[in-house]
Every structure is written in C-alpha cells, then in structure tokens.
Swiss-Prot record:
InterPro entries: ARM-like, ARM-type_fold, HEAT_Maestro, Maestro-like_HEAT, Maestro_heat-like_prot. HEAT repeats lie at residues 356-393, 397-434, 436-473, 477-514, 527-563, 594-631, 633-674. The lineage of its organism: Eukaryota, Metazoa, Chordata, Craniata, Vertebrata. It holds the Pfam family HEAT_Maestro. The gene is MROH6. One of its GO terms (cellular component) is cytoplasm. This is Maestro heat-like repeat-containing protein family member 6. It comes from Homo sapiens (Human). The keyword Repeat applies.
C-alpha cells in the first residue's frame, strides 16, 4: 500500500502526536477484552489531547482483526531458513495486479509501528521498549506473536519508507527498526538482506541507521558475519551481507562494536574476496577494478575491499590501508591469480602497523588451516605465513610445531601450498633463535631450487638469502651446496629468477669475504670464479633488475678479492667502455691464468644467446680475453672452436653483433699464429715477439641510459 495510513494522515496534515501510546494501548486491550490501564513498561508519557480525526486511524489499525479474522493466517511466518534469498529474488507471477492481503497487513503493522515510535520520540531507550510493547499488544489482539511477524514489519517499513518525509516520520521509521533489532536482530537482518542485492538506497540507509545505534549495531554485525560465512546459505546471501557490512562499517564509530570478533570478521571478508576472485565475473563486475573509482562500489569485490578498508581505518589502521595502496595490495586482493600475494601484503602491513590484532588473528587462523574449503584454507595459509614475520606472534606456537607444519606443506601436490611453505621458512629463518633448525631448513630450500614454478624458486632464493643474513650463517656449507645449483640459475630464462640468483651470490660473497681475503681456496672461491663470466655478461642483461644485481654482486667480489677494479666495473656497466673492459680482462688474465680457458669456454656459449646485447657482449669479451692471454694458456682445439663460432656469428642479422664477431675472430687468428711460431733455442730468443694490435670495437647500440651518477662516477676513462 502506497504510504499506508501514515501517508493518508500526512496528506490531511494531522500532527504526528495525534495518537498517544496510552490511547493506542487502551484501544488494543479494549478490543481484546482486557481491563484498561497504563502500560506496564516504560515511563508514562505526557498525555496529549487526542484529536477527533485520529480516531478513524486508530480503528483502521485494528480493522483487519475484526472485519476479516480469517485473513490473519495469510501473514507469512518466519521459516526454517529466514536468511534465504532464493524466494526474495524470484520474479513475481504474472496476472492481474492485486494488492495481496499479506502486503496490506504488513502496511497496517508498519503504520502502527511508525505512529508509536513517533509518539515516543522523546522517550529515548524507554520509548524503544514501549514501542516493542505496543507492537506486541497489537499482535496479541490478533492471536499472534511479535517474533513471528518481524519479517512482515520490516517489509512493511521498506514499502513505506520511500514515501516518508525527512524529519520526524523518518526518525520514527528508524526507531521502529532499532526496536525490532534490539530483540530480533537475526530476523531483521534476514528481512533486510534481500533488499541489499542488488543495492537499494532505502536498505542502505536502514543499514546505516542500525550502524549508528550503539545498542544494536554489535548484534547486527554478528548476524551479518554469520550470513557472510554462509556455510549453509546460498551465494547471494554472502554477497548481500558483504554489501551490508560495507554500509555499516563506513559509519564512523561502528568498528568499535566489532570488539571480540574483529579478527573473525577480517578473515571472513578476505576469504570472501578469494571466493569472488575465483568465481566467474558477474555482469556488474568490471574486468579491471580501478582504485580511483569514486561513489558506490561497482562490483561485489570492490564492495568487499571498501568494507575491509573501513574495518581497518575505523580501528586505527590507516597506515595499513596506505601501505596496501602504495604496494598495489588492494588490486592484488581482487585478482584471481594474485589474491594470495595481496593477503601476504596485508599480513605484512598489519605486522608493521596493527600488531594489536595479531594474536587474535593467529588464534583464528589455526583451525582454518585444515579447512576443506579451498579459499578459506589457502587464505588462512597465506595469513599464517605472513604473520610469521612477527616474532611475538610466532612464539605463540612452539618452533618445532611451526617448522613441522611448514615442512609438511612441502609435500603437498599443490604448488601454491609449497610456495607458501617456502615463504614461511624464509620468515622463520629471520628469527635469530632458529640456529638449531638450519639442518632441517636447508634440504627443503635447496630442493626447491629445482622446481619448475617460478614462485617456488624465487621463494627458495629469498629464504636462502635471509638465512645468510643471520648471525653465524653457515657460509661454507651453503657455498658447497650452491656450487652445482646456483650457476644454472644465473642464466635462467625468467628475469626475476636471474636477478634473485645473482643477488644471492652477492650476499654469499659479502658474508664470506673474510675467508676470501685470506686466500682460502674453498668452495666459495670456486663458485665465484665459475660465475665470473655470467656476471660480466649480465651487466648487459635486457632486464634492468638482473643488470643492477650483477653490478652489485661484482662490486662485492671486487671488495672481497681485492681486485681494485671497482671503477672499471662501474664504467663497463653504465657506459659499455671498451677501454675499461680491456683493463678488467688484463687484470683477470694476470690473476687467474689457469682459468682463462674456462673463461673463454663459458663466454663461447653466450654466442648463441637469443638476446642481441648478450651475443655482442660475448664476442667483445672473447676479443679482449684472447688479446691479453699468452699463447701457452689456450690450446689449439679451443682456438679452432672459437674461430668457427665467431665466423658463423659474422653473418648475424644485427650489424653490431657481426662487426664485433669479425674483430674478435681476428684476435683469435693472431693468437693461433703466435702459438704456432717455432720457439727455437732460448739463447737465440733475444728479440721479443711483436705485440698483437688491440681490438677496436665500435660503440654498442644496445647501451642503456646510464645511472652512474649515484655511484659518483663521472664517465669512462679514456686511454
């Protein structure tokens, strides 16, 4: 009914106070046959004079029970699944338009509720209690109970609220809703949820009004939390609950009502984001969610993100929200393939800026780790992994228990679970008290270096680097174990893996520089000399991260081996200077003459690289190594092989690569001729051999823009 009795009374401009609580209650009890008297609960409001035009309205409120007593059974009662949205979302049957009797009675109940609340507007909490008493009396007169008609009352309010004027009528409607929610929060939530999907302006305002009422907002939030978890409810129920939570949590001060179940609510929202990310895109969900969107959320995922932001901000976690925005965490949370990365970023931000909730989160996570629901289990695993960065939180469980759980994940067939386990082992390695667990950590981390999934290899490299940062790190053991495993990763096809592997080598050299300075011929020295050529060539890597990581690692090697070549290394890295590279090769040939054949063999392999800058860099490096090598250092077979490969490279489609190969081939030919010259008696060799002319290479077209200014290097040194 459009506006109900309230709409008619407003049309006649009758004052809202025309009816009093006493008049209503006495009229109801008189029709029920009870003795008249004052209401038993709440303060006695001041008696107002009842105007004559109010009497027909009072009669209209109770007319259904007298005129058609049989129609009382047509009011729908709460079923066994009051929160189900299936029936609410079904289209209405076709046929001639009629106003159902149940809708008419809902309107009458809503009229009574609105009038009563308006009369009690000044009575505060006592007025709310009196509102409930009056509604109960009205229903008892018809042989019904209030708890059975909450759905009907809320539906009636939803029908009449759009036609109410701002001010006292609107406040009366909100008071009725609060009065019902105080005693019947679950029924009110279940009745409002169908109007939240799709979004409804009236329902949104009612959710916000419940949020502002500190007596009921906690109960309503709890019911929405259970609806969001929705283990037995359909999916639309969780979506509607997400939108309702977004409306309520956006109200200032509402987050305080979540005390006691804040971690539970946060995990439920993040898990809901995981479910939304894994489900097919709904029609209202954009393919790309933009953080700059303003106004109402454009999708269920963005609505959940806004609810999560409001939950964090309302509890003083504004820095968590800011960190997530700067790191792109919110965008990752809504992505199907990046959700767990977003969870890890959220956990890291909370460890840094919201540690007062970590204990509660950790306790709520533990039972979820064994959940049969994949989104819930994986989200809990990611949170568990991220929270291990907090030492006080990690101490809530025994070290052995955490380690056993993480190692168990390494045997899971799902790569994502193994990846999370490796990340957890990396966080565990940062704890200085885990020295005795190194022998257990290492096999799992080293074994992951052979995985095909880039996430697993990257996590293992990161964990090994963290392990090296610990005091008393097992440098010699790691050097021996990484000897056969690390060099292949320096040439991995994945940019991130190359950069991480080179960085791990640099960290290893920095931690073991004491033994290297003493000249110890251990596994670390062997590993560095084996990796020297890849590091020099990776200075020209198309990936900036890999190139910068190589430069940093070579600087660590220069410091540990006392080469005195830092200026040359920086000049080669940023200016691709042939003069600096020539000086560098001369020093290496003088320091390690026995390794020159290995250097040349390694460089020869890069002549077949699919990357143009690396092919040219390899040709140039061969030219300078051959130029500075003595004839007796290189055998004829190696020279022949180099000459053949450089000859094939002279037909390279890139002119710069072909030109460099031509110059280096000439150097190989000159070294071969010098090696083949007859030596003669020692006394007759008075005149020195003629010096071989140095190679001259053109400037590289692949040179990147230099950032050498931050190193304090003004430019290449010219001869």
């Amino acid at each position: 009914m459009a506006g109900g009795v309230w709409g008619r009374s407003r049309a006649r401009e009758a004052p809202v106070g025309a009816l009093t609580l006493t008049a209503l209650t006495e009229g109801i009890r008189a029709r029920q046959g009870q003795p008249q008297g004052p209401p038993s609960a709440g303060p006695q409001p001041k008696s107002w004079e009842v105007k004559p035009e109010a009497e027909p309205q009072t009669q209209a409120l109770t007319a259904p029970s007298e005129a058609e007593p049989g129609r009382g059974a047509t009011v729908p009662e709460a079923g066994s699944e009051p929160c189900s949205l299936n029936s609410a979302l079904e289209p209405a049957p076709e046929g001639p338009h009629q106003v159902p009797q149940s809708s008419w009675e809902e309107g009458v109940l809503a009229d009574l509720a609105l009038y009563t609340a308006a009369c009690l507007e000044e009575a505060g909490f006592a007025g709310t209690q009196a509102t409930v008493l009056t509604l109960s009396s009205a229903l008892e007169a018809r042989g019904e109970r209030l708890e059975d008609q909450v759905h009907a009352l809320v539906r009636g309010l939803l029908a009449q609220v759009p036609s109410l004027a701002e001010g006292r009528p609107w406040r009366a409607a909100l008071r009725v809703l609060s009065a019902l929610a105080l005693e019947h929060a679950r029924d009110v939530v279940c009745a409002l949820l169908p109007r939240s999907l799709p979004a409804d302006r009236v329902a949104a305002e009612l959710w916000r009004s419940l949020s502002r009422n500190q007596r009921v907002n906690g109960q309503v939030l709890v019911q929405l939390l259970w609806a969001l978890k929705g283990a037995s409810g359909p999916e639309p129920q969780a979506l509607a609950a997400t939108r309702a939570l977004g409306e309520m949590l956006a109200v200032s001060g509402c987050v305080g009502a979540t005390r006691g179940f804040y971690p539970h609510l946060l995990l439920a929202l993040v898990t809901q984001l995981h479910k939304l990310a894994r489900s097919p895109c709904s029609p209202d969900m954009p393919k790309i969610w933009v953080l700059s969107h303003r106004g109402p959320p454009h999708s269920h995922a963005s609505c959940a993100v806004e609810a999560l932001k409001a939950l964090l901000t309302g509890d003083g976690g504004r820095m968590v929200v800011t960190c997530m925005e700067q790191a792109g965490g919110w965008r990752r949370l809504v992505g199907a393939h990046t959700h767990l990365e977003g969870v890890l970023l959220l956990a890291s931000a909370m460890v840094a800026h919201a540690d007062h909730h970590l204990r509660g989160l950790f306790a709520d996570l533990l039972p979820r780790l064994r959940s049969a629901d994949d989104p819930q289990r994986l989200t809990a695993m990611a949170f568990f992994t991220g929270l291990l960065q907090s030492r006080p939180t990690a101490r809530l469980l025994r070290e052995e228990v955490i380690l056993e759980r993480l190692l168990t994940w390494q045997g899971d067939p799902e790569p994502t679970v193994r990846w999370l386990g490796l990340l957890g082992l990396g966080h565990l390695a940062l704890n200085r008290r885990k020295v005795r667990h190194v022998s257990t950590l290492l096999p799992a981390l080293l074994g992951a270096l052979g995985e095909g999934d880039a996430r697993l290899v990257g996590a293992a490299l990161g964990a090994l680097r963290r392990l090296l940062l610990r005091p008393r790190a097992p440098v010699r053991l790691l050097s021996a174990e990484l000897g056969p495993r690390l060099p292949p990763l320096l040439d991995d096809t994945r940019d991130s893996i190359r950069a991480s592997a080179v960085g791990l080598l640099g960290t290893l050299v920095r931690r073991g520089r004491g033994g290297l300075r003493l000249g110890l011929r251990g596994p670390l020295r062997k590993l560095v000399l084996q990796s020297l050529v890849p590091l020099l060539l990776r200075l020209h890597d198309p990936s900036r991260d890999a190139a910068e990581s190589s430069e940093w690692t070579l600087a660590r090697c220069d410091h540990a081996f006392c080469w005195g070549l830092l200026e040359e290394l920086v000049t080669v890295a940023h200016y691709d200077s042939p003069e600096a590279l020539s000086h560098l090769c001369c020093r290496l040939v003088q320091r390690y003459p026995g390794h020159v054949p290995n250097f040349l063999s390694q460089t020869q392999g890069y002549l077949r690289s699919p990357q143009d800058p690396l092919r040219r860099a390899a040709a140039v490096l061969i030219g300078f190594l051959v130029h500075h090598a003595s004839p007796g250092c290189v055998n004829q077979d190696l020279l022949d092989s180099l000459f053949q490969d450089l000859g094939r490279l002279q037909s390279d489609p890139k002119p710069a690569v072909a030109a460099a190969a031509h110059v280096s081939a000439q150097q190989v030919a000159m070294l071969a001729r010098a090696r083949g010259c007859p030596r003669g008696p020692r006394l007759l060799r008075i005149a020195p051999r003629p010096a071989r002319p140095p190679p001259v290479f053109a400037d590289s077209p692949f040179q990147r823009r230099s950032v050498a200014g931050r190193w304090g290097c003004s430019g290449p040194r010219r001869a």
